[in-house]
Structures are given as C-alpha cells and as structure tokens.
C-alpha cells in the first residue's frame, strides 16, 4: 500500500530554464563547492584559483576571516580560530568537553545545553561557524556562476544522526541557502563514479577524511544507487594521524607544548610531515631547536591501529549487507586521508583489489553532490537516476509491557514511510502516549528514547475498539517525523525528532552488537513481557465483569472460586515463569467460561426485551 508519494523538491517549472545549483562538500578539514557546467561536474575555485577552502573561521577583534586566511591565524590566535567544527555540530557541551578536551577554545553552555565557543566577536555556536563557511562557499559559487543560487545539495557523513543533520540544515539556512537535500558523502562519491565510469555491481566506498570515516556498501544497477549497508566513525580521520605524529615528536624530543600556540604549531608540523610521507620515504621535522626524522615505516606503525579500526568497521558493513569481500567489484577511495600509501595498501589487501582513485579523492564528493543538485533543481528532469540511502538503526514504538515494536527496520532504504495500527488497552481510554525509540533490542529499557508525544481526543470505547494509525516517515535527509491518528475522528498529533545531541558511532556499533549478543535473552524477556501483558488484559476484563455482573449472575461459591483463580494469576504474574503465567491465564479462562456465557445471554435478553419479531427482522 502506497503511504507516501515522494516528489523531488525544486523541480523547475519550465524544463528549458537552466537554474543555478551547486553541490557542497562541507568537510571537517576542507570544504569544496562544485556545479554542473556544460554537462560536466566541475569544482568552482576561489579568486586565487584554489579549489579547497579550509573549514576554518577566525573571529578577530576587528574582522572575520574564513578559509586559508583564517587557517593562517590558527597558530597565532588559536582561541579565536575555530577548526574542525564539523566534529562539534549537533553535540552537547558535555559530549564536546569529554571528547575534545585538548581543543584550545573556551566553551560555555547555551540555554539548551549545546556548546558555544567564546571568541573576540562573542559566543559562537557550531551552527554559526558552519554557516560562515557555507556563506564563503556561496560567495565563491555566485561569483563564478554569475548569479544567485536556486538551491544546494550539502553532503554529510552517512552516520550523522538527526541532530547533526538538522544542525547542518540550520547552518545552511542561516547562510541564506535553499537546501535541496542532504546527501550522504559515500553516496555522492558513488554517484560521481557511477556516471563517469558506468560501473554496475557491488561497490564499497571507503571515505577517510580529516575528521570522519565512513564505509558504504552499495549496489549500482541500471542507474539505481542502493546503499545496502553503512558503517562509520565520527571520531576517526586524518586529524588523528596528525595527533599521532605530534605525540611521536613529543616522545622523541622530550618537549611538550606549553601554550595553545605551540600545540597548534606542533600539529601543523605533523600535518606537513604526513603530506611529505605521502610521496617521500621519510620526512624531517624541526621543533624547538630539535630536528627529528620519521620514516614512512614508522608512520605506518603509528597509524596501524586506526587503519585496522576502519577495516573492522568495513567488515561489519559487509556482514550487514550480507556481502562477501570477494563480491565487491570496485572500491572507491574518498577523502584526502586516502592518499596515504599505507591506507590504500591495507584497503586493497582487505578487499583483494586495487582501489579506484581516478577521481581526486578530495573532490569526488563535491562533484557527485553537484550532479545531484543539478537533477533536483530541475535541470535534468529526464534523469532516471535514483538514490537510496538507509537508516542505520531500527525505529520503533513502545507497546504495553515495555516492549518495542519495530516500525522501520535497520538498513531500510530512505525516503520511507511505514504505518501500523494500534489500539487502546483500557475501557474508556481517551489518550495514548507515543514513545519513539531507536535500537535493535526487544525491551524499551535497552533502546534509545528519541521522543514522546500524546494523542488526545480518542473517543471513549471498549478496550481494543479504537484504531490508532501511527506513521513513521524518514525523509531524504534522514530526519524522522511520527504522526498518530485516531481513524474515526481523524484527530491526530505528531512530532519531528530533533534530539539535542546524538549518538557516537561507537554507541551505534555497541547497540547493534548488543542486539546480537543478547538475542536469546531478549527473546525470552519479550515472551515473558507479552505473557504478562496478556495476563493484565485478562485480569482487567474479569475484574470489570465481576464488578458489573458478578453479584447478579454468580452464586457466592462461584464468585469466590473466580476470585481465587484470579488472585492466583495476579500472584504468578509477578514471577518470571512464562509457562506458569500461561497456565494461570488458561485456568482463569476455564473458571470464567460459564460466567461469560451467562453475561452474553443476559445481554441478548436485555437487547430483545420489549421487541416484536418483526422489529428484529426489519430493524
């Protein structure tokens, strides 16, 4: 049954009218902007013909600088120079402080607990900093294209959660941009390679940027890009390589940076050494009157644990996709950190084939985003290309007994809408709380709560008579909205899930692993909970029936017998013996069968009293 008709946003009213649109790779280290010109996706350079815009903003006393000019201030004024803001967006202050305690900035909490960075120009949120970077990219694009943009596609890591995605959209809107879609970075890369190389089959997209890592397993067939599975780590990237080299320098020289400026200078030297080692066998580093040499072999040893960590994530993604490594026909390398020879070597060994690097790994994401932007803005209305991303964790709802009913399973392609009908538990129930959950476990306590809302105005009916339709909808940006509607009155309530901060990828992985490790125990716990819910339902209905008709239809002995069996079920329900509860339910059913028959007869007699046969035959 079709629940939702998806229409692409921003379709041009006139097919012949060309509209200006760009793809933006909002990266941790660098950002890029691209557009389709004369049928080809190209990077738009700045005034100095530079393609990469460092994702850095400097808030000086008198002026604000973005890009390379800001990056040059990093070692001179680190407290007012914000770098790698992508790591901070959509996170809580406590999360930022625990994860990134080495950052030179001073943080304060906003009213809703999100981090604000204290600068010479006042407190700045990660959304505002990202907005300044996007404004710079917008300026470059409009200067190059000679007009105002109709829309943009912005890429995000596949593992960005709702809060991080929504924060990215908020930053774009603050910059005055019309967001056509947020697109997963690996999907954008696959789009670029799919068009240029015409490849079909299973493809792995290994994306190692400055601050994030993503792996996506995709199936490309006849213009359809389907993401079979994703995995990632929002705290793994080339920045971590730099910090490992910096730690090695400290160990070799026995000197520790004493100031934030020295720390930033050390990181810069480490980054330069990493770049040198991409093409050379060794690199010489001069630090505070000391000169040390690091070989490529030493560098490989330093980064081995991080590269291995990324490959373990690849293994999990293959398992999720139900794909063997030998089935992967091509491996696409994305992100500047994939230039490191050891990374390419290890990825090649893992998948058993040489990775594809024909498109600049720094540019491939932006180029793919530009292609999608050109389609969405209406310049390619004849395109039959379809992009299918997936939800990384199952989305469900709490039911009676603290159970989780999954509405949208993990790895379902998006956009998607799924609906399911629920009913009331008690007679006369006029409201229902919808508790939205995320995770793979069977019980509410073991899953992540995303939000709650209450549907009011349900007509009072007997338990089980009301029909409440709950619809879960995940849009193309991965944002979730939930609607509950009572079918007879059409009264409804809804919520858009917008958490204040999100899960780390380690937590996502742990949640998935936990569901496997506890599968048997979870199933037993679910069966016990379901039996308790059924016992509660039976107990409730018998108590109501006894109160209404027990004195009239039952003898004293019959009444006491039912009460005794009822009490036995209430006692056994408190235990954890599922079979004993089932036997108690059966015993109560047997004890009340005659009572139920008498109630039915009494109800029929009452309905027929005072009516003729003709009234019944011709109502």
Curated annotation (Swiss-Prot):
Family annotation (Pfam families): HSP70 (PF00012)
InterPro entries referenced in this protein's UniProt entry, alphabetically: ATPase_NBD, Heat_shock_70_CS, HscA_NBD, HSP70_C_sf, HSP70_peptide-bd_sf, Hsp_70_fam, ISC_FeS_clus_asmbl_HscA
Matches recorded under PROSITE patterns: HSP70_1, HSP70_2, HSP70_3
Highest rank taxon of the organism: Bacteria
UniProt keyword annotations, A-Z: ATP-binding, Chaperone, Nucleotide-binding
GO BP: iron-sulfur cluster assembly
MF terms (GO), sorted A to Z: ATP binding; ATP hydrolysis activity; ATP-dependent protein folding chaperone; unfolded protein binding
HAMAP family per record: HscA
Function of the protein: Chaperone involved in the maturation of iron-sulfur cluster-containing proteins. Has a low intrinsic ATPase activity which is markedly stimulated by HscB.
Family: Belongs to the heat shock protein 70 family.
Protein name in UniProt: Chaperone protein HscA homolog
Gene: hscA
């Amino acid at each position: 049954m079709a629940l939702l008709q998806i229409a692409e946003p921003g379709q041009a009213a006139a097919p012949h009218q060309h509209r200006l649109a760009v793809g933006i790779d909002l990266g941790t280290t660098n950002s890029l902007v691209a557009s389709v010109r004369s049928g080809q996706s190209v990077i738009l350079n700045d005034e100095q013909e530079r393609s990469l815009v460092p994702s850095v903003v400097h808030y000086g006393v008198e002026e604000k600088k973005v890009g390379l000019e800001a990056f040059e201030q990093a070692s001179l004024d680190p407290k007012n120079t914000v770098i790698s803001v992508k790591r901070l967006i959509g996170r809580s202050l406590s999360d930022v402080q625990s994860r990134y305690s080495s950052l030179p900035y001073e943080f304060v909490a906003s009213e809703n607990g999100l981090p604000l960075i204290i600068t010479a120009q006042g407190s700045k949120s990660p959304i505002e900093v990202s907005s300044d970077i996007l404004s710079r990219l917008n300026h470059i694009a409009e200067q190059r294209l000679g007009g105002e943009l109709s829309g943009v596609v912005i890429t995000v890591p596949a593992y960005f959660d709702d809060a991080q995605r929504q924060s990215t959209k908020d930053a774009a809107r603050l910059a005055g941009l019309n967001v056509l879609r947020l697109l997963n970075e690996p999907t954008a890369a696959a789009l670029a390679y799919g068009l240029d190389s015409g490849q079909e089959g299973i493809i792995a997209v290994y994306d190692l940027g400055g601050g994030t890592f993503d792996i996506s397993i995709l199936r490309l067939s006849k213009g359809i890009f389907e993401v079979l599975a994703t995995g990632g780590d929002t705290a793994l990237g080339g920045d971590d390589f730099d910090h490992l080299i910096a730690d090695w320098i400290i160990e070799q020289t026995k000197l520790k940076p004493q100031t934030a400026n020295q720390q930033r200078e050390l990181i810069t030297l480490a980054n330069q050494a990493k770049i040198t080692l991409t093409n050379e066998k060794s690199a010489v580093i001069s630090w505070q009157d000391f000169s040390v040499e690091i070989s490529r072999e030493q560098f490989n040893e330093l980064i081995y644990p991080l590269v291995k960590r990324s490959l373990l994530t690849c293994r999990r993604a293959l398992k999720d996709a139900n794909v063997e490594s030998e089935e992967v026909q091509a491996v696409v390398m994305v992100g500047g950190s994939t230039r490191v020879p050891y990374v390419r070597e290890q990825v090649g060994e893992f998948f058993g084939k040489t990775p594809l690097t024909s498109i600049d790994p720094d540019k491939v994401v932006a180029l793919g985003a530009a292609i999608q932007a050109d389609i969405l803005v209406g310049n390619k209305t004849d395109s039959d290309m379809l992009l299918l991303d997936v939800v990384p964790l199952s989305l469900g709802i709490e039911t009676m007994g603290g159970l989780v009913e999954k509405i949208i399973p993990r790895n379902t392609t998006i956009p998607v809408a799924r609906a399911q009908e629920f009913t009331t538990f008690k007679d006369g129930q006029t409201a229902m709380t919808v508790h939205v959950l995320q995770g793979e476990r069977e019980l509410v306590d073991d899953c992540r709560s995303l939000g709650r809302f209450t549907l009011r105005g349900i007509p009072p009916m007997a338990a089980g008579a009301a029909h409440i339709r709950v619809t879960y909808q995940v849009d193309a940006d991965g944002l979730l909205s939930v609607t509950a509607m009572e079918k007879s009155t059409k009264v409804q309530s809804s919520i858009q899930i917008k958490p204040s901060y999100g899960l780390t990828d380690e937590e996502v992985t742990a949640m998935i692993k936990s569901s496997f490790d506890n599968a048997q125990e979870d199933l037993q716990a679910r069966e016990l909970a379901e039996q308790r819910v059924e016992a509660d339902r039976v107990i409730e209905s018998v108590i109501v029936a006894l109160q209404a008709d027990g004195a009239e239809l039952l003898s004293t002995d019959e009444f006491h017998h039912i009460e005794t069996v009822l009490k036995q079920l209430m006692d056994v329900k408190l235990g954890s013996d599922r079979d004993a509860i089932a036997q108690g339910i059966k015993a109560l059913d047997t004890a009340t069968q005659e009572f139920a028959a008498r109630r039915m007869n009494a109800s029929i007699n009452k309905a027929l009293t005072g009516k003729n046969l003709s009234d019944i035959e011709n109502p």
